[in-house]
Design a protein with these regions (language model features):
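Alpha-helical sensor/transducer elements of the RecA-like P-loop NTPase core
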Residues: 50, 189-190, 194-236
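Sensor-1/coupling segment of RecA-like P-loop NTPase cores
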Residues: 150-157, 165-170, 178-208
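C-terminal leucine-rich, beta-strand-based interaction scaffolds used for sensing/assembly
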Residues: 2-5, 246, 293, 297-382
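A short, basic N-terminal segment
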Residues: 1-38, 43, 372, 380-382
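Amphipathic alpha-helical "lid/sensor" segments that cap RecA-like P-loop NTPase cores
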Residues: 229, 233-297
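P-loop NTPase nucleotide-binding core
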Residues: 36-37, 41-46, 50-157, 188, ...
């Protein structure tokens, strides 16, 4: 039986299948060693969650306690408060009897614990209060985490993923309350990460918002190509594949150095070259079209939801992905405008998740294979 396809995508990538992020992990470790606050901003498909889970392993190896919370999983403040309190407590205390005693002492929370046949504890908390008191329970949980970390003489790192979802709760009231509590803490570092870049930036760059200048902003960019190339080549060599270095660089060009794109291109390449084990330039050029065909139903749905001006703009951007959409040259070349109309289309497409706006103000396709669909597959339905 041959080696399984090592290029994983679409989920959490762990162990030997995780591509290099050494510099980013080193930087985040340094920040957390100093118990700072970091806002990690990243477009989707850049491997943010995989990076954070890899980071947790490294921090635990250095005797730091870690709690990871994905806000996508919690629809309201009550569930968020319960998760934060339970996960931070479990990170610092593993003795189930002590946890039970600890949870029994909360004013706003009541314990809900289950133990499997092997004696492993699974701790969760339910709120015993009305919705209007949920914020008080969250703050109680944050205070408890600080007190327990102090008692244990341990550094605690709290990672809140998809942090932009905080806005779905009760607006800026919770932001102010969380900031106030964080500023009192001395044993906890925080990483607030999010893929909704426009929402994240509004939260942390607006002087009127509570998180303004609470911590540094770190943008997660592409993986350094040299290290990533070695990762890809090592797996291809293990699988007995033959590829030219220049041809491999073309994969990074097509994928725009986006980790998800590279992983998927290599995944399709591995499968399509399995019989010959020889990767030729013609195959590499076909890869994005193969992927665009695979995802055509998804692109068709997005296309049908776009207005005519938005479709025209998307066609133009698919042809000129590095230009500025407000430039006169771009507008004249593609016969679009005025700038106010372009701005309205861009804002709508960003909101739909078709495009994303970079920290530098540029606009890119959220899905790097959609331009190939527009240019090749989508011609029949324009």
């Amino acid at each position: 039986m041959g080696l399984e396809n090592p290029f994983k995508y679409g989920g959490v990538v762990r162990g030997p299948y995780f591509a290099d992020r050494r510099s980013e992990i080193k930087e985040l470790k340094r920040e957390m060693a100093n118990l700072n606050q970091v806002f990690l901003v990243s477009p989707r498909r850049f491997g943010k969650t995989c990076l954070l889970l890899r980071l947790i392993g490294g921090l635990k190896h250095e005797a730091m306690a870690c709690a990871y919370i994905d806000l996508n999983a919690f629809p309201d403040i009550k569930s968020f408060a319960g998760a934060l309190t339970a996960l931070t407590a479990e990170a610092l205390e593993t003795n189930k009897d002590k946890l039970l005693k600890m949870f029994a002492g909360f004013q706003k929370l009541r314990p809900k614990l289950s133990v499997d046949p092997d004696g492993n504890i699974s701790a969760g908390l339910e709120l015993a209060v009305e919705e209007k008191d949920a914020l008080s329970a969250l703050l109680e949980g944050m205070r408890h985490a600080e007190q327990l970390a102090t008692k244990k003489k341990k550094k605690l790192v709290v990672i809140i993923d998809e942090f932009s979802d905080l806005e779905k709760y009760n607006g800026q009231t919770i932001e102010k309350a969380i900031r106030s509590e964080i500023q009192k803490q001395t044993h906890i570092g925080y990483i607030f990460s999010g893929s909704e870049q426009s929402v994240m930036l509004a939260m942390i760059r607006d002087p009127k918002r509570a998180f303004y200048k609470l911590g540094r902003i770190m943008e997660l960019g592409p993986i350094e190509q040299g290290a990533y190339s070695k990762f890809v080549l090592s797996w291809l060599k293990k699988g007995g594949y033959i590829v030219n270095d220049d041809d491999l660089r073309r994969i990074f060009e097509i994928g725009n150095d986006v980790p998800y794109n590279i992983q998927r291109l290599c995944n399709v390449m591995w499968d399509n070259a399995m019989e010959t084990k020889t990767i030729k330039p013609a195959l590499i050029e076909k890869l994005p079209v193969i992927i665009a065909q695979q995802d055509s139903p998804h692109y068709e749905m997005l296309w049908r939801s776009a207005s005519q001006p938005q479709k025209i703009l998307l066609i133009a951007l698919s042809q000129d992905q590095t230009v500025k959409p407000f430039s006169k040259d771009f507008q004249l070349k593609h016969g679009i405008g005025p700038s106010s109309s372009i701005k309205a289309s861009l804002d709508s497409l960003v909101k739909k998740g078709v495009l994303f706006k970079t920290l530098q103000g540029g606009y890119h396709f959220a899905d790097g294979f959609m331009p190939y669909w527009i240019d090749y597959i989508g011609k029949t339905i324009r």
